[in-house]
Amino acid sequence: MSRPLILVTNDDGYSSKGIEILNNVASNFGDTIIVAPNSEKSGKAHGITLYDPIGLKKIDNQNQLIYSVDGTPVDCVKIAINSLLDKKPKLILSGINHGLNVGRSILYSGTVSAASESIMIGIPSIAFSLQKSEEMDFTNVDIILEKLIKNALDEDFPNDVVWNVNIPKTVNEKINGIKLTKQGKSNFNEIYHKRKDPRNNTYFWVDGAIESIEEDLDVDEVAIRNGYVSITPLSFELTSQKYLENNQSKGFFDFEK
Amino acid sequence: MSRPLILVTNDDGYSSKGIEILNNVASNFGDTIIVAPNSEKSGKAHGITLYDPIGLKKIDNQNQLIYSVDGTPVDCVKIAINSLLDKKPKLILSGINHGLNVGRSILYSGTVSAASESIMIGIPSIAFSLQKSEEMDFTNVDIILEKLIKNALDEDFPNDVVWNVNIPKTVNEKINGIKLTKQGKSNFNEIYHKRKDPRNNTYFWVDGAIESIEEDLDVDEVAIRNGYVSITPLSFELTSQKYLENNQSKGFFDFEK
């Protein structure tokens, strides 16, 4: 039996530690190709590059096919599928992000967006993130990844939801298990530092931290805090069915000019 | 009674025709402030600027308070709320985008993302887009905007869904009405043009067009094609409830290391 093709990407750049570990584990299950940004692209969300040329470089590496893209994580998936791969990959893996992607800040995440782009073209996908610590410690992360990637290669793995996987930093010592969770409402609480440049122009630096407002153990961020690996199934069909049902019959929408 | 504060933004830049018309109509209902990108930021999605300083300029204009931000549409909303406004606006309006934001390509849209950022902080929001034509013709668009903005200032207007409003280019002659719609599955069908620079480095330009695969009149893109203004209520709570219900009891998630 031929080995499945697995596309590996991220938003921290092709040379990050996280993508190296993800690719090492994925290589146990299939033929991998890395197509990832040339540098840190955190916060790029589902952005695409429309008005600039997108540079592509093949990285010199004897053991692994790696392409570096001067663009966003979503650009990487699109260019891989449209121009680099001979066949459709069986699975697209994104990460391992250096830092959590939980709560509302998921919307800003390039790691998750590479995965949502994948399911939009019908390819199953997982986004992996490891909780930040002073020195990112990836000990034991491979054990979690092995279990999840093996499962994702099963025929019944969904291609219409993204598995958003977040791993607590305690994984280097122990974890309490894996939890299927909901996206929480916790948000990134920004502080904008206002400064002046030498020519007296105003500019800002953004800073801040996740504001924890959740308590239920089935919420992504709370599961992590309690030492669980969190898996949130995300759908990108955005229509609010509830709003449609409650408002469909309102006269307002029958307006004729 | 004091007039409500309305924040106006977009992704085409503060000097675009679309935002001027949107702001003109909004001014009939409240005190407006424009905080918008300094240039075209289409395709920036929900991106935020994490690793660069974000420049801010007050634009010299006697009749209207305008700030220009060297950042994404979401940066504009965040900086306005965090640093520029004395009080929370009653409503945040985004657009009018020069071109539709329908189907799956909503995910790439800076116009829609400024609106989704707004509901994440609990402020009602509408994203407006006008179908592209060779010369963007905004005739009669103000009539539609007036009706929708007036409605959005009602106390019962939702602050947990975005109204994604798309207006057909036929509005300059006639429209057939307003339809409450669903987000379609039509996607942007990209073509990547591969080129070489003078130093033999590979780069790509992206090009393409919306691929229409929908037929039901209650789908955003089909409503537009049939001469209706399309209003899709969008929610950004991404958890797939369906997946949770179907998989919650699976042993897989009880894994103990």
Task: Spell out what each predicted region is.
Chain A
Residues L100-S109:
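Glycine/threonine-rich flexible loop motifs
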Residues I126-L153:
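Short, glycine-/small-residue-rich phosphate/pyrophosphate-handling segment
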